[in-house]
Amino acid sequence: SLGQFTRWLGKICEEEGIDIFCGFSGSELLYENEKVIGVRTGDRGIDKHGNHKSNFDQGVDIHAKATVLGEGTRGSLTKTLINKFNLMQGKNPQVWAIGVKELWQMPKGSIKPGYVAHTMGFPLGHDIFGGAFIYGMKNDILDLGLVMGLDYKDPSIDPHHELQLLKTHPWVRSLLKNGKMIAYGAKSLPEGGYFSLPKLTVDGAMLIGDSAGFMNGQRLKGI
């Protein structure tokens, strides 16, 4: 999984002397004469009323020659940078979707690794863009998910509920027979494509990954 990959890569970075600050948010970008010079981390140990608790820890300024923003979709620092330097000028607005998925442990020998199926239509209405995916993984894991555009007009639509409806389809239900759901997750997706890519660099900073909108919308892959 991508989580396992990043943990593995993180250990290699630390062995090379790179500091990784887990649990710290980036509260704002630091500037010097319109050049990005780093990030200020967020304060920690603040209660819901904004008061300092006994474990209060003030944020610190981290300076860098180059600040790389890889916050995923709609990151707070990325939005600030895009707005400050008008990086979307002349570009199409970004288009968003959400993917929800479940991992199912199936009986031994029942899943062929590399199996791929895609669906369209049910359970989504005619006015909702999207479809489902089913992947056969190693160790008899079945990956079942549903992706739908976030431009739907009905405020009562619940993507997770739509995934549950998908599992009522006779064919999908037959695939999951005797299986057990072991994990689930969700992720927002930038689907605008090439013409929705912002300008990627400013003096001292750059955008990468979903912050830049690099996902391949046709394959729903960004790595």
Language-model features and meaning:
Residues R7-W8, I12-S174, G213:
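Predominantly flavin-linked oxidoreductase catalytic cores and closely associated redox partners
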